[in-house]
Amino acid sequence: MDGLKSFLSTAPVMIMALLTFTAGILIEFNRFYPDLLFHP
């Protein structure tokens, strides 16, 4: 379990988790409000 915690706290894993989270939020936001992301 300690090795898993040290693996999950490394920088590439944290970056991938953050990017996945951000992409999910953008996809859901774009699903409900499709015109707001491309406003000039």
UniProtKB/Swiss-Prot annotation:
Localization: Cellular thylakoid membrane
Topological category with respect to the lipid bilayer: Single-pass membrane protein
Main subcellular localisation: membrane
GO biological process, alphabetically ordered: photosynthesis
Record's keyword annotation contains Ribonucleoprotein: no
Recorded GO CC terms: photosystem I; plasma membrane-derived thylakoid membrane
Membrane spanning stretches: 7-27
Disulfide bonds: none
Keyword tags: Membrane, Photosynthesis, Photosystem I, Thylakoid, Transmembrane, Transmembrane helix
Signal peptide range: none
Keyword Thylakoid: yes
Membership in a protein family: Belongs to the PsaJ family.
Physiological role: May help in the organization of the PsaE and PsaF subunits.
Protein name, entry field: Photosystem I reaction center subunit IX
UniProt lineage: Bacteria, Bacillati, Cyanobacteriota, Cyanophyceae, Synechococcales
